[in-house]
Amino acid sequence: MPSKWAGIQSPKILDALRVALSDDKEFSHGEVVDLIRAALDDGILTPGELNDLQIVAENSETMLARAKTMLLYLIEQTRNLYGTDGQFGLTTMQERYAAEIICGFLKRMGTGYFPKLDRDRVGIDLLFRIGNPEIMNQDTLGICGPIAFLYGLASDSPRTYAQYAVDLYDNGKARIGNIVVAPSKGCRTYSPPSSMSPADWLAAASLRDSDNWWFDVDDIKVGFSASSSIGDIEKWFVQAGYTDVESKGNLVSGLDPRDINDLNRYQGEGRRVVLRINSKMLYADTQNETTYRGNHVVVLRSPINRTPQGVQLTVFTWAQGEFKVPQGGALSEKDFLGNLYGYVAGKPF
């Protein structure tokens, strides 16, 4: 191997380099995707392998600009998410199968039906989400319902999540079980805020827009019109293939103590549980305030612990998979239930 590759330590990456350069000494975009695939072959992308990939990106004289940008984005985002000493992992066969779907997507050309979304950024962000769905984030857009549903989908069936997202991008429509998602032109041609992942916009905004009879989800100012009811989420659960789906909702008043028993039972049975709450519950200075409607959707990540002081639980919300409630002092059971407006629970497929 040429001396410019002398610093590369990973046998996997060295082998992939030899294959890529064996024919014409040039790096095609597809060969760079294969390099990423090789690095993920054992399901782990280590800090050392990231350093090796950076050597390739910085020293190759024949790598196309698109491929170099994609590779550097992968390196940058991995370090942003996991730190310089952290590593990205795909721990299950389902996750690795989903990664194969995404690598195939990365090899293709063009912007598909979403001209404002870069294919390679979408693909790399999808890779991160099948390995760690907790990074999903709706940013300022009121699509917490779809994000909560897709968090569950990516956790329970990463293959289904990956296929859904790449089909959306390439075909302008996709299926999740019996859900047919066909977003409007306004949604497909919208440029989301730079602070939001294009993968999250693609998957979540399309789901909400396709099902929204009120407004197109093509403007972050839409707000409440983009939010999802318990009925919407229950329908997604059932049509996606979740079984033993149970739901309860109240538009203007909270639930009652028996619902905590039911939620803990569903959690213990391994069901995916989504809660519709008022977001004031999530902040120390407002958690005990009276509210009159739900305005946010979170995923229950722990049993609801009852103590003499009040309740304690963990939820997924806004890219935080282990968000503790309460954030301030004690949250009484009464105040918790007063901010809980519904739930959906179902067994993963």
Q: What are these language model-derived features?
A:
Residues 1-4, 55, 59-109:
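Low-complexity, glycine/serine/proline-rich disordered segments
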Residues 6-37, 41-48, 54-55, 60-69:
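Acidic, glycine-anchored loop motifs typical of Ca2+
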Residues 19-24, 38-41, 56-63, 77-84, ...:
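Surface-exposed polar/charged interaction patches
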Residues 27, 45, 136-141, 225:
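Extracytoplasmic/periplasmic, Sec-exported soluble proteins
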Residues 31, 49, 140, 145-149, ...:
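Stable alpha-helical elements in mature extracytoplasmic
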Residues 83-219, 244-245, 260-276, 308-311, ...:
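Active-site nucleophile-adjacent alpha helix/oxyanion-hole segment immediately C-terminal to the catalytic cysteine
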Residues 217-257, 261:
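Hydrophobic, aromatic-enriched interface-forming segments
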Residues 243-349:
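Active-site signature of cysteine proteases
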